[in-house]
């Protein structure tokens, strides 16, 4: 009897070990909490494609949108921590819990519900208007906004989302009042601008470079500490006398509690993905420099960025949307 029990226990332990060693044994879902066309989606798709090569399983993109990304982020925060649900998120992952505090509401998730895998990219946002806009410079826009408070509109990926916060920081620094029109993601926000439904937009470079080159949009300024290589003629806000700096980054996360061996496999796949020639070519094509950080360095980066964004949310305060 003892021999049988020992054999059963050994078989169970061996089977468990083999199951762990076999990760991944099926497809992985990469949740993008925004619609197609935005920075998270544009970065997530080539990342997923490259990771497939090294994980030997499909990595399927699922756009789970709404509430400025909060719906998709909350979904991943509460997903089973087994490595089969991961997420490509933006810096707004840090903003939403802080914004909810302002309104004394319960956040749909907390940041400690996520385990960072890798930072993939980080770029300053770009202020764009349509090519037929009367504003040729930030100075033109600011002067007009002072004459018509609350009349100049801008779209964003959602209330207190990454693109919203960048514009609020600029408006505060310029002492102007703008009209915020939130959408469900960066893609719809850009479509609203191109379609003439709003007047301006802050966006990641990858989402607007094509429209700029195609003559549909005009860049006025960037939120970086230096000019973008892809837009060398476009000044930074700091050059223009506005003390604002803002970056939109894309990073991979898993639910907190994901086993260490699984996290190691995901981290390794992400590292190999950013070194993949095909991935590099795609990122170059969409004018998005790779800014890779492995989990420990990414955690430090995230902590610092989250503190900066928390301070920015408090500075901006409660923002009411004019619908």
Task: Identify the function of each model-found stretch.
Residues 4-13:
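Sec-dependent N-terminal signal peptides
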Residues 20-113, 151, 159, 163, ...:
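N-terminal (or domain-start) structured segment
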Residues 25-27, 172-176, 260-323:
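An extracytoplasmic/periplasmic, membrane-proximal ligand-sensing/linker region
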Residues 88-93, 156, 185-186, 203-208, ...:
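Beta->alpha turn/N-cap motifs
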Residues 110, 122, 208-275, 304-307, ...:
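C-terminal lobe and pocket-closing loops
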């Amino acid at each position: 009897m003892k021999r049988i029990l020992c054999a059963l226990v050994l078989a169970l332990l061996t089977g468990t070990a083999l199951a762990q060693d076999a990760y991944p044994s099926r497809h992985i879902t990469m949740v993008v909490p925004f619609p197609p066309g935005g920075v998270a989606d544009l970065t997530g798709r080539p990342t997923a494609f490259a990771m497939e090569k090294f994980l030997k399983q499909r990595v399927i993109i699922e756009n789970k949108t709404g509430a400025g990304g909060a719906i998709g982020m909350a979904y991943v925060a509460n997903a089973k921590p087994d490595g089969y649900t991961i997420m490509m998120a933006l810096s707004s992952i840090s903003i939403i819990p802080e914004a909810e505090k302002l309104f004394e509401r319960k956040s749909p998730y907390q940041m400690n519900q996520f385990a960072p895998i890798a930072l993939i990219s980080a770029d300053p946002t770009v202020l764009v208007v349509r090519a037929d806009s009367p504003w040729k410079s930030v100075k033109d826009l600011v002067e007009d906004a002072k004459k018509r408070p609350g009349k100049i509109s801008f779209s964003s990926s959602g209330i207190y989302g990454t693109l919203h916060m960048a514009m609020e920081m600029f408006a505060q620094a310029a002492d102007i009042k703008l009209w915020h029109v939130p959408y469900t993601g960066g893609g719809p926000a850009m479509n609203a601008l191109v379609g003439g439904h709003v007047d301006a937009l802050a966006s990641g470079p990858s989402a607007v470079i094509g429209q700029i080159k195609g003559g549909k949009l005009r860049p006025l300024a960037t939120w970086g500490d230096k000019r973008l290589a892809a837009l060398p003629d476009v000044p930074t806000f700091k050059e223009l006398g506005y003390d604002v700096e803002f970056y939109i980054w894309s990073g991979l996360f898993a639910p907190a509690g994901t086993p260490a061996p699984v996290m190691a496999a995901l981290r390794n796949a992400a590292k190999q993905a950013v070194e993949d020639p095909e991935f590099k070519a795609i990122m170059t094509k969409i004018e998005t420099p790779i800014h890779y950080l492995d989990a420990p360095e990414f955690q430090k980066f995230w902590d610092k960025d989250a503190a900066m964004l928390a301070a920015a949310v408090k500075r901006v305060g409660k923002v009411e949307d004019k619908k």
